[in-house]
Design a protein with these regions (language model features):
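Short coil/turn linker and secondary-structure boundary residues
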Residues: 4-5, 26, 191
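C-terminal accessory/tail domains of diverse enzymes
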Residues: 12, 29-36, 40, 44-217
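Short, functionally important structural connectors and interaction interfaces within domains
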Residues: 4-5, 17, 136-139
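Acidic, His- and aromatic-enriched active-site or binding-groove loops in soluble protein domains
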Residues: 1-12
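Short hydrophobic/aromatic beta-strand micro-patches
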Residues: 22-24
Length: 217
């Protein structure tokens, strides 16, 4: 499933290292703002926290080769629903359309391309058991988007780095999500989806020279 969905999926699994930061939310409306803000700011996150210019010990033309790899990965990227009015139900409906990577029943059981929705409906050809909450938690953990929801919101676009940089990322997003959320959300709601997506695709190579809404990051 992974290599079929993205040509660098296995590189992502075995050859990259990033920082993942978890944030709590207080309500569905609070979740929506944090989730969407995190997604809209992905180009800036990549540019600020780029730290992977090498591949196999050789320089590349990227500030963040890791993010270039992740952009060619199955089940990754920016979720299209991040540009829409968000609810828990909409997130759930979107997530269950992803193909299942595996289910665990004392061993790993692989599907034949079925989605988690198929699993819920009893159409998992290699398994007759009903889907349960643990299966859904496993499925959530196999979604590799730039921002994802589990029991918390996870921001995932930062390259791994040393301790000083490692502390900066959580502090940056804590300030935005918990102290300037409404103001930041108001700003990003003026941005066009296509401009955010273009900046997202360009940011691993252009870094802070990436343009978004007519301005360099």
């Amino acid at each position: 499933e992974m290599p079929k969905g993205g040509k660098q999926s296995l590189d992502m699994m075995y050859r990259t290292c990033g920082i993942q930061i978890n944030y709590d939310y207080t309500s569905e409306s609070n979740f929506e703002k944090i989730f969407r803000l995190g997604n809209y700011l992905t180009p800036l996150t990549i540019a600020l926290y780029s730290n992977s210019p090498f591949e196999s010990g050789k320089p590349t033309r990227y500030y963040s080769y890791r993010n270039k790899v992740w952009q060619n990965t199955a089940r990754g990227g920016i979720m299209p629903i991040a540009f829409e009015k968000m609810t828990f139900e909409k997130y759930f409906d979107h997530i269950i359309e992803y193909p299942i990577l595996f289910a665990i029943r004392n061993k790993y059981v692989e599907p034949n391309g079925q989605s988690f929705k198929d699993f819920i409906l009893g159409n998992f050809s290699n398994l007759k058991d009903e889907a349960n909450l643990k299966d859904f938690e496993t499925h959530l953990a196999t979604i590799f988007t730039e921002v994802r929801l589990k029991q918390y919101i996870e921001v995932r676009s930062l390259d791994a780095c040393d301790w000083q940089c490692l502390c900066d990322g959580p502090a940056f997003f804590t300030g935005l999500f918990y102290n300037a959320l409404d103001e930041a959300f108001e700003i990003i709601m003026k941005w066009k989806k296509e401009n955010v997506m273009n900046a997202y695709l360009e940011s691993p190579q252009k870094g802070l020279n990436t343009e978004l809404e007519g301005k360099k990051l």
